[in-house]
Structure formats: C-alpha cells, structure tokens
Curated annotation (Swiss-Prot):
Active site (catalytic residues): 101, 104, 127
Organism from which the protein derives: Coccidioides posadasii (strain C735) (Valley fever fungus)
GO molecular function: cyanate hydratase activity; DNA binding
The encoding gene: CYN1
SUPFAM superfamilies tied to this protein: Cyanase C-terminal domain, lambda repressor-like DNA-binding domains
Keyword entries, A-Z: Lyase
PANTHER family: CYANATE HYDRATASE
Listed name of the protein: Cyanate hydratase
Family: Belongs to the cyanase family.
Lineage: Eukaryota, Fungi, Dikarya, Ascomycota, Pezizomycotina
Amino acid sequence: MSDLASLDTSQHPYLPQSASLLFDAKAKANLSFEQIAQHIGRNEVATAAIFYGQAKASKEDIIKLAELLRLPATALEMQMGGFPDRGRSVEMPPREPLIYRLYEIVQNYGYAYKAILNEKFGDGIMSAISFSTNVEKETDEDGNNWAIITMRGKW
C-alpha cells in the first residue's frame, strides 16, 4: 500500500512517547489506519487519535495493537495506559496547511454553527467526549474529489 500516514517527530515535539513506537510499527507493517481500525474494532479517526495520543486506548485496544503491530504489550501498556494529555500536540494557530484549514473552518463558521445549534437544541454545547467523527471520500461527476467530515456529539 502507498501513501500511508507517517510521523516526523521533529514536527510534533509534544506527542507522547507511544506515538513514535506506534507509527514506526505501522510503517513496518505497511498498514493504513483503516486496516488497523478494522483489527481493533474502532473507526479510523478514533484509531488515528490513539496514535497521536489524543484518545484513550482501552486495555483491549492495546492488546490488539500489540498483536497486529508486533509490539510488546507491556511496553504499550506502560506508555498508553494512562490518560491522554489532549490538545497539546499542535501549536496554535497550526502551521500544517490541512490542520490550519480545519482551524480556519472553525474561525469562519464557528459562530454560524453555534447559532444554528442553539436554535435547534437550545442553550448548551456539543460534547467532544461523547463524540464520534468520520471521514469519507466523494467523487463528483466531473471527477473532483471531495472530503466529507462528519461530527456527531451529544448535546
């Protein structure tokens, strides 16, 4: 498989130690996040978030990752068994162009989203804990590729 996501640790100095271990093993196994997600029983975004240290891996996730990536389960458990330190992995504003575009979407549409959500649901917030997200690829009739990012959060 080609075009697999990899990790340049010099670009991500705040990621947990487990990130390097997981990304190196992912590259050696030549696996996509979709393939890894199927093995551990999660969606691919949640799986990638585990690799970046932004989601909590369950004991079962750690065992399945160790098995698939041929890593010592005890080493993974030591590095991933605690609680994630979310939100520290990226400088703000982000410099990476795709991450910046996502940031820009929130800058441009954040208050519009808030207004519509408040009108539909009343006062409150959308959870980022009771949350799921998915990425799909769509190709239109002209052959242009479109990214579809779905976010689902408890109100």
